[in-house]
Amino acid sequence: MAGIDNKAAVMGEWFDCSTTNHRKRSKAELGREFSLNYIKNEDSLQTTFQESSRGALRERIAARSGFNAPWLNTEDILQSKSLTISSPGLSPATLLESPVFLSNPLLSPTTGKLSSVPSDKAKAELFDDITTSLAFQTISGSGLDPTNIALEPDDSQDYEERQLGGLGDSMACCAPADDGYNWRKYGQKLVKGSEYPRSYYKCTHPNCEAKKKVERSREGHIIEIIYTGDHIHSKPPPNRRSGIGSSGTGQDMQIDATEYEGFAGTNENIEWTSPVSAELEYGSHSGSMQVQNGTHQFGYGDAAADALYRDENEDDRTSHMSVSLTYDGEVEESESKRRKLEAYATETSGSTRASREPRVVVQTTSDIDILDDGYRWRKYGQKVVKGNPNPRSYYKCTANGCTVTKHVERASDDFKSVLTTYIGKHTHVVPAARNSSHVGAGSSGTLQGSLATQTHNHNVHYPMPHSRSEGLATANSSLFDFQSHLRHPTGFSVYIGQSELSDLSMPGLTIGQEKLTSLQAPDIGDPTGLMLQLAAQPKVEPVSPQQGLDLSASSLICREMLSRLRQI
């Protein structure tokens, strides 16, 4: 009974009947104090109870078994004090029943072996399956701090990027920049995740819709080329391919060289004398034809050659402004400028058309720029070219479907020297005069210098207007192509500046009833030589009937002559 009294005394110490203390202390604190007091007093209670009941228990065991059991000294067995249960809801029985911390001492009914605690090797294999690596730190004796468990940064993404980067370097060798075709760059766009823009190219062959997109890696290597459309032509020969693609240097350059029909290889200036004769009637002088890079040149000195050289360089710059350097932020062509160049190339029916069609340069000396060659032209532009302070005027033929153009400029060293460059071939005949249809029907062979027919026959015969000192037209001039054995009508004379047109002759022109007498020159010539002044109306004087032909035919021819002179 002493054990029971002691337990009652201990129970008295556990519970405090004061209501004031229970109100002030929380439930968690009471539970923690209860568990600590229970464990603290368990040792003394167990010792007292064992001493009182040790003799009775030993006697009962001896009576049942028939022999006295040896005395077990338990005083030397130390009790572990490291086990501390801080939570009131967790009991020691729960720990004993857990299969993780304690092993089962019984044999397995199926294998007959003892179950063992998982080894360190098994734990290592278990943690290898976990994708996220954890950094375990030593737990301090004061308790478990949630901040002690930290996640290491995941390097798997960086590893994949490094692997892709290495793959891109290997693919750069497998993506050739030159595929055998000629390409022209027409645009680029910045893409996300890359410092180099995406480049867009299209085939330079006429009417070919093939295009490609070039992707570059972060290092500047070509990693992908996407083609759209099919080529409608075969690959050009190696000596005519001009696409340059640099791989590994970061440069993105496409240069399209000018190609000429019949020439393959370099763009060097090749000059020789054509075996085809080209006779130009210019008074007593005769011109010579030279072919330079597939271009016919008519001239009398270095002025025509300089004009042709500037014209070739200008065409090269216009046709091949698609050179773009995109390495380290160097020179790069803007979108607006590229659109303007493409629009200009479309208007002139392609950039390569001008360099492949025949080109004739005519040099003459005149005080006026607008020279009548029989065709009708419309001016569509004017600009100052490099190397010549004088502006250049651009004209194109007004006939439907005709693509012939010309540009007129004065030489840089001689202001009176006029250089006219004809590009292309006329696909039509010389139009008739605007004011009369009889002249076109009766004298079409004398009022035209057919460029198209004579170009096809390889005997180019361009109109050659004469200088101011020699007059606009003489007996052997090709401006009106008059016959030299015919004489001008009586009393007909026209002056321009201080030069007299005294050799104007018309076939069959003989005034029958009238005579034109008073077309006189101005008293003081205009310094520029561009003024044409007519005096009073022509006076009509009767003549004998045997001096001429019909009045109507002569009057029509005179009106035609006056209209021609007004146009000049």
From Swiss-Prot:
UniProt main location, coarse: nucleus
Subcellular location as annotated: Nucleus
Ligand binding (Zn(2+)): C203, C208, H231, H233, C397, C402, H426, H428
DNA-binding region: 172-236, 366-431
Biological process annotations from GO: pollen development; pollen germination; response to cold
Gene3D superfamilies linked to this entry: WRKY domain
Region (Disordered): 230-252, 337-360
Keyword entries, A-Z: DNA-binding, Metal-binding, Nucleus, Repeat, Transcription, Transcription regulation, Zinc
GO terms assigned for molecular function: DNA-binding transcription factor activity; metal ion binding; transcription cis-regulatory region binding
Top-level taxon of origin: Eukaryota
One GO CC term, this protein: nucleus
Function: Transcription factor. Interacts specifically with the W box (5'-(T)TGAC[CT]-3'), a frequently occurring elicitor-responsive cis-acting element.
Record-stated family: Belongs to the WRKY group I family.
Protein name: Probable WRKY transcription factor 34
Gene field: WRKY34
